């Protein structure tokens, strides 16, 4: 039995829509209002700079991961397989698209079982928080075991679901299910948003629930309400949420330093300088997605490799010019904020911090 054509068409349409950045970009991520401090007396060899990080028992080559995007159908599967091979070559982590459809079409499990291509890197499976409630802890855990992944990402995408006429509406029980799954699993659990961000208080609550890592996935990147609005020809509603959400840097600046080792940042990080700023603010890793998707579909695998080569070069230059030999040194107060961002941050803290 093949996957229902409408499911495959929706996935294909999502990719097509996301290829046009200007149509689906949500708000501002405020990265342009952060500057790294220049150090004119960096007294070491550029070759001494290390971008290496350790995560889930793997040594990775830079603090960047390819975030979960799509899965299912030939187009999505070919895309994932290519990216997993690229990620393994680069020695960076990668997440796969949601494996929700495997509960209806278990015969397609090999399309999601890509650890054979990711033997040197962490590979993340992905499922919606609502599906934990729907399918139950034991079935989710069994599927993760069969997929042989190093961690699972569970995504919070209420905005996208509410914009989708056939999307989920009942989110009751997701916090309890996340806590139970975190306790039950033998692999780390990562919770991520999908473009609207996670507040400092929600970060604290998720960590108390037993979550290993949190991907903020803040506003300023792909806005999935806009994606669904375009797909369903209902921008009258979707456009009302074009600037909804919390930029990841607001949360990074709003949480205690002690929590940042458990936090990833994503949401509109497109350049090596964006990545450098996110790391300087304390993020453990930076996630990239749409920028990789566009490079791949517009110009192929070589364009993705070129993108990451640029990331490496810019990140190393930023570290040298700020006097940082290592990522830990870059995280030591090597930035300053514009007056505009300070004002915006003050408003944010007034309403989001207790």
From Swiss-Prot:
Q: Which family does it belong to?
A: Belongs to the IPP isomerase type 2 family.
Described by its record, this protein's role is as follows: Involved in the biosynthesis of isoprenoids. Catalyzes the 1,3-allylic rearrangement of the homoallylic substrate isopentenyl (IPP) to its allylic isomer, dimethylallyl diphosphate (DMAPP).
Q: Which biological process, per GO, is one annotated for this protein?
A: isoprenoid biosynthetic process
Write out the residues that bind Mg(2+): 161
Where substrate is bound, by residue? 11-12, 98-100, 160
Which prosthetic group or cofactor does it need?
FMN; NADPH; Mg(2+)
Q: Which PANTHER family match?
A: ISOPENTENYL-DIPHOSPHATE DELTA-ISOMERASE
Instruction: Cite the entry's keywords alphabetically.
Output: Cytoplasm, Flavoprotein, FMN, Isomerase, Isoprene biosynthesis, Magnesium, Metal-binding, NADP
Chain residues that bind FMN? 67-70, 98, 126, 192, 222, 289-290
Locations listed in the record: Cytoplasm
According to UniProt, the reaction catalysed is:
isopentenyl diphosphate = dimethylallyl diphosphate
Q: Which organism is it from?
A: Borrelia garinii subsp. bavariensis (strain ATCC BAA-2496 / DSM 23469 / PBi)
HAMAP family recorded: Idi_2
Oligomeric form and interacting partners: Homooctamer. Dimer of tetramers.
Q: What is the main EC category here? A: isomerase
The name of this protein is Isopentenyl-diphosphate delta-isomerase
Keyword Cytoplasm among record annotations: yes
Q: Which GO terms describe its molecular function?
A: FMN binding; isopentenyl-diphosphate delta-isomerase activity; magnesium ion binding; NADPH binding; oxidoreductase activity
Supply the EC number(s). 5.3.3.2
**Gene Ontology terms: cellular component:** cytoplasm
Q: Name the major location.
A: cytoplasm
């Amino acid at each position: 039995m093949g996957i229902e054509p409408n499911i495959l068409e929706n996935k294909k349409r999502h990719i097509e829509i996301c290829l046009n950045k200007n149509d689906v970009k949500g708000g501002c991520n405020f990265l342009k209002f952060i500057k790294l401090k220049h150090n004119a007396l960096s007294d070491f060899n550029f070759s001494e700079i290390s971008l290496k990080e350790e995560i889930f028992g793997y040594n990775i080559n830079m603090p960047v991961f390819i975030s979960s995007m799509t899965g299912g159908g030939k187009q999505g599967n070919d895309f994932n397989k290519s990216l997993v091979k690229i990620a393994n070559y680069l020695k960076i982590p990668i997440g796969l698209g949601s494996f929700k459809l495997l509960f209806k079409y278990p015969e397609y499990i090999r399309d999601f079982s890509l650890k054979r291509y990711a033997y040197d890197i962490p590979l993340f499976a992905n499922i919606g928080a609502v599906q934990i409630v729907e399918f139950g802890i034991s079935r989710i855990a069994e599927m993760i075991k069969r997929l042989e992944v190093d961690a699972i990402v569970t995504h919070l995408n209420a905005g996208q679901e509410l914009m989708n006429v056939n999307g989920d509406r009942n989110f009751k029980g997701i916090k309890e299910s996340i806590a139970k799954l975190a306790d039950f699993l033998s692999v780390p659990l990562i919770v991520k948003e999908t473009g609207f961000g996670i507040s400092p208080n929600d970060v604290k609550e998720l960590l108390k629930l037993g979550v290993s890592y949190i991907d903020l996935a803040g506003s300023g990147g792909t806005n999935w309400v806009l994606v669904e609005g375009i797909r369903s020809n209902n921008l009258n509603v979707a456009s009302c949420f074009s600037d909804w959400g919390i930029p990841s840097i607001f949360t990074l600046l709003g949480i205690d330093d002690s929590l940042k080792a458990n936090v990833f940042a994503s949401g509109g990080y497109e350049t090596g300088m964006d990545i450098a700023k996110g790391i300087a603010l304390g993020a453990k890793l930076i996630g990239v997605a749409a920028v990789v998707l566009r490079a791949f579909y517009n110009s192929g695998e070589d364009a993705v490799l070129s993108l990451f080569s640029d990331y490496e070069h810019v990140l190393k230059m930023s570290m040298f010019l700020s006097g940082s030999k290592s990522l830990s040194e870059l995280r030591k107060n090597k930035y300053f904020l514009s007056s505009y961002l300070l004002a915006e941050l003050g408003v944010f803290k007034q309403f989001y911090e207790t």
